[in-house]
Amino acid sequence: MKHTAYIGLGANLGDRGECMRTALRRMAACVGISLERISSFYETPPWGNIDQPPFLNAAARISFCGTPHHLLKQLQSIEYALGRVRREHWGARTIDLDILHIEGVTTEDDMLTLPHPYLTQRAFVLVPLAEIAPALVLHGKTAAEWCSLSDCAGIVRAAELSGPYPLELIAAADEAGGIGRAGGLLMHCKEDMAHFRRQTMGGIVIMGRRTMESLPDKRPLAGRENIVLSSRLQGASGFCVVPNVPALWNLLGQLTLDASRRIFTIGGAECYRALLPYVHQAYVTRLPGIYGADTFLPPLKGFALTERRTGEHCIFEIYKRI
């Protein structure tokens, strides 16, 4: 039997955003757990013990099979794997995963109390919970009503990506999986170029240095935010340059703070490999023939082919993470 649960997430040590996204990815990988909805991440002041760094907080709705206590053990194992050490009540932590509420379930024992005993007292819990489940009834009031009664001072939406898999991948590969040769494209297929433009227009595109250098006149792609992931490149006109993945997350959080945008990794091979763990969907154009490539698309392990359409000169495929 499947149950619906609401999980609170928090962190105030280390790379808080990536730790929370990693926790969400690990939750999604647990047997019997499905992530259904995730709130924005929020900057929040510490609660209880105020002599500690500020927190990031969020809420997630999941479905799960099994007992509440088994779910608790799964969440605690994720906390442990991510370095959670329980030294101080209400103290600083790398990650905190709390079961806030399970629909249709109440329980109270030494291990677990549901609904969470402090649920309606904590604005840092209520704000993200009300975002994803405003009509959820808790002790006679909705989450939105409890939120309106709370002191939400100091709680603001964070410039952080909250999705565990926030990226999409788009590539064109020949029959051998090749994607490039001598720093450039294998071939120019107008049909694929139109597909690429249609998918990415208005979004954010992330590329490696060699891909940037292969663009016509090294100019950014029009109508898109262009980001180069490179530890060697100091700067390039019209491009945002980030030296590593943590810096990329910071920039993407800022670029998507006011409105969500599609985010694509567009190559080359090193960029694909670095960002594939964070991709939820891949668009792959299959080009007929083999063109002597020297760079190749990484295997899409953990993805399933969900759509295949034959074009005039190529085949368009969509893969989704499973």
Show where each model-derived region lies.
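Conserved hydrophobic "DFG−1" position in protein kinase catalytic cores
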Residues: 62, 101-102, 171, 321
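Short, glycine/charged-enriched secondary-structure capping and boundary segments
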Residues: 21-23, 52-53, 108-110, 114-116, ...
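Conserved histidine-centered catalytic loops in small-molecule metabolism enzymes
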Residues: 103-167, 239, 295-322
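Enzymes that bind and transform nitrogen-containing heteroaromatic metabolites
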Residues: 165-322
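A short, local hydrophobic-aromatic micro-motif
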Residues: 34-39, 127, 280, 304-306
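Generic structural signal for secondary-structure transition and capping sites
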Residues: 32, 80-84, 134, 152-155, ...
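Nucleotide and nucleotide-moiety/phosphate-recognizing core
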Residues: 2-9, 13-94, 103-105, 148, ...
